[in-house]
Amino acid sequence: MPAASTTGAPVAPSLALLALEPLRGIADYCASLLTASPKAHGDGHPVIVFPGLAGGPLSTRPLRRFLDKSGYVAYDWGQGLNTGPDGDFDDWLDRLDDLLVDVHSAHGRRVSLIGWSLGGIYARELAKRSAPLVRQVITLGTPFGAMADANHAATAWRLLNGDTSQLTPGLQARLRQTPKVPTTAIYSKTDGIVPWRACMEQETYCSESVEASGASHLGLGTHPKVLRIVANRLAQPEGEWRRWDA
């Protein structure tokens, strides 16, 4: 599947999809309560979950609970509410890297990183700078192909931080670069907040894009298909990563 950058400029989701996001997010959560446990069972390795913009421990709790029940050791990102990078971007990543180092040391195993929306940017960048500590990266609706525009999350970022001046052309080009660890980008064509094309990864020997059809942006952490994809990806033996084959 081609990268987002080769399919034309990303277009912001319609206002109708945006307006329906809260209700659809609730519906996705309710659907997850009725979903059977995944067939794939984990090997106990640690997973850090990074929330989306304006999200925090509460928003990722259902996903972390799912991971724990699936046989992993799930960690919150430890920074409270996600209002965007605080100060210099790389200094901010240093703080997140400290948690990655601590979790890796505690388990003596590589750590999988799951990032929802903006949280996926953190996961990808940590994997680029600390690849030996990272087992794989999974992003949920992360618009690394168009962070500064064409998405309603950028508007929210401006409301929280005043502007998107940190997102220079150089940084945006850097964010689009694929981590050199197994990477799965999950996207939904019915995402009401970010353009789905901007959430698609290049197809390489260790990266892929997987569609979670019907999922809302706010429901990406609980939608049954997303959970099935996440469970399948995490259950692959270390060093034997293969692309998704639905």
PLM ranges: what are they?
Residues 179-246:
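C-terminal catalytic-base region of ester-bond hydrolases, centering on the histidine
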Residues 2-10, 15-28, 151, 158-160, ...:
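Alpha/beta hydrolase fold serine-hydrolase catalytic domain that processes acyl esters and thioesters
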Residues 6-12, 35-37, 142-149, 172-173, ...:
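A broad, low-specificity signal for short, low-complexity segments enriched in glycine/proline
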Residues 45-58, 62, 68-79, 85-181, ...:
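Serine-dependent carboxylesterase/thioesterase catalytic core
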Residues 1-48, 54-70, 106, 242-246:
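Flexible, membrane-associating and regulatory peripheral segments of lipid-active enzymes
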